[in-house]
Amino acid sequence: MNSFPLPGSGPAVVAVPAPGQGPGWWAGASSAFLDADGTYVVAYRVRNGHDGIDQTVVATSPDGERLTTVATLDQSRFGAQWMERPSIARTGDGRWRLWVCMGTPETKHWWIDVLEAGDLPGLATAEARPAFPGDDRTAVKDPIVRLVDGRWHAWICCHPLDVEGAEDRMSSAWATSEDGLAWDWHGTVLAARPGTWDARGARLTSVLPDGRAAYDGRASAEENWFERTGLAERTGQAGSFAQVDDGPVVDVRYLDVLPLPGGGYRIWYEARLPDESHELRTELIGPAATERQAP
């Protein structure tokens, strides 16, 4: 797994600065898509302080670094108290789908809706329909949704709600769909490991076509919002992943990896600043990065 595209492999660029100073002022939790014309589409979450208005932003970019906002959705539209990581994808007939992740007010419950539009700006006003509602036992959030060979796959972060005060525990589940709307749930595919650095939970953040993956882990409730990145890979069991390292590989969270057609990768990740605000950074890794650095 030494070749996994990790932060620090290329020059880092701040794609979205922290929206303010201090804890809870976060830009990050991105989901990126490379369109057929070479345009990058990046959806991400902005938290304007823990008591502020969260937003899901959709932006386009010619290079993955300079982002232009084309749609903004805030939590009030959905009656939510918070928003977290979205997921952006394109259907087989060229329409756009955006999965948005919201927290139910005054609870620890989270749910995921999906919006669909013919163009990206249309997502701002598109009808929201339930995708993964969760229930009184499980909060669902931070989706990764991909269309692969005509079949939809979703990896969902799940938080059990059975123990009050311990709702930060997390694992990753997998679901599949023929149309991306009605889902078959296959259960947990990556779980925490007791007694290790990720004992409190494991949240998939990137799944590559070759079966390699990145995930966020933490050891305790005190490390909530201070997750670090670990690596995993698919096992022989359908859909399942297993951790491949005894410790984290980098101190960032929500690592989002996009393979590029010509080789190499463009990555985005949420980086913590000394004042505990977060910014969205990006790096170009691989042959293109080497060419860019050449004198």
Spans of model-derived segments:
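Carbohydrate-active catalytic/glycan-binding domains of CAZyme proteins
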Residues: M1-P295
